[in-house]
Curated annotation (Swiss-Prot):
The keyword Transferase applies. PANTHER family: ASPARTATE CARBAMOYLTRANSFERASE, ORNITHINE CARBAMOYLTRANSFERASE, MITOCHONDRIAL. GO terms for molecular function: amino acid binding; aspartate carbamoyltransferase activity. Carbamoyl phosphate binds at residues 58-59, 108, 141, 144, 270-271. It comes from the Bacteria. GO terms for biological process: 'de novo' pyrimidine nucleobase biosynthetic process; 'de novo' UMP biosynthetic process; amino acid metabolic process. Catalyzes the condensation of carbamoyl phosphate and aspartate to form carbamoyl aspartate and inorganic phosphate, the committed step in the de novo pyrimidine nucleotide biosynthesis pathway. Coiled coil: none annotated. This is Aspartate carbamoyltransferase catalytic subunit. Pfam families: OTCace (PF00185), OTCace_N (PF02729).
Amino acid sequence: MENLNLVSLPHFVNVENLDVEEVEALIKRAEYFKKGGATPRLTTPVYITNMFFEDSSRTHTSFEMAERKLGLIVIPFDPAHSSVNKGETLYDTSLIMDALGVNIEVIRHSRNEYYNDLIDLKEHQHLNMGIINAGDGSGQHPSQCMLDMMTIHEHFGHFKDLKVAIVGDITNSRVAKSDMELLTRLGAKVYFSGPSYWYDKEFDKYGKFEELDKLIPDMDVMMLLRVQHERHADDPNEKAFDAQEYHEKYGINHKRYEELKPDTIIMHPGPINHDVELSGNLVESKKCMFVRQMQNGVFMRMAMIEAVLRGRKLGGLE
């Protein structure tokens, strides 16, 4: 059995509530699982459901794989055939799941901070289940953030003074918001690039906005973000968007790839728009961590779920 402090949490909805020691412990635990370390022995059944109200392939499947590796009983939930379509609120849906015996909900929702309705309960409310945030609108994406931290740590062994460039549709990216905050606390130096109209001045407290080609030779990590067309309904820049022009200005092409330092890594939360954020034939290149991020996601989500199991004393864990 590995010797480390095990994290206990009642919910896992953002990374801001984690201290650095908890982040480091979760990374070590995920690395332990990846190396084939034993999963905790559950002495009583634990029921979990994945409620994804936005499209997902990687995150949904990754969570379910993590749940099954931990020995949890996964209860199917399909929002397209649920009473949500009849006007049922998220709270009422969760109340029903709680009454049926579900212990933990993994939720992705289009509304920012939807989870507050489920964990900041009023005196007359008695919902009693763990909530794991799989992404809330353009707000936070804690599991993607944590698997990103694991991937960086796995490659470099530390965070202090690493130079990380976050590039692309930053304003609409929940991944960027989670990552920039945590990277800064872990001691990395954050930089931003991409279209200025998808950058908000509120991010200045985390790092400096620069032209991409100025950053390329000095960065340790290039974190590329998907252009989120589905969140641009009221954005006048969407009509003028040109994929080839974006790739030339803000994408990693072969020329920029060759200008990166030998040890630099490229990351992307997926799905990748080929030949927009990244040249399609670089997706499986040596520097690109896209596949490794997905692999690491299963083990990090195992660590996150285990933290909630322990925090809620489920499965006989404490």
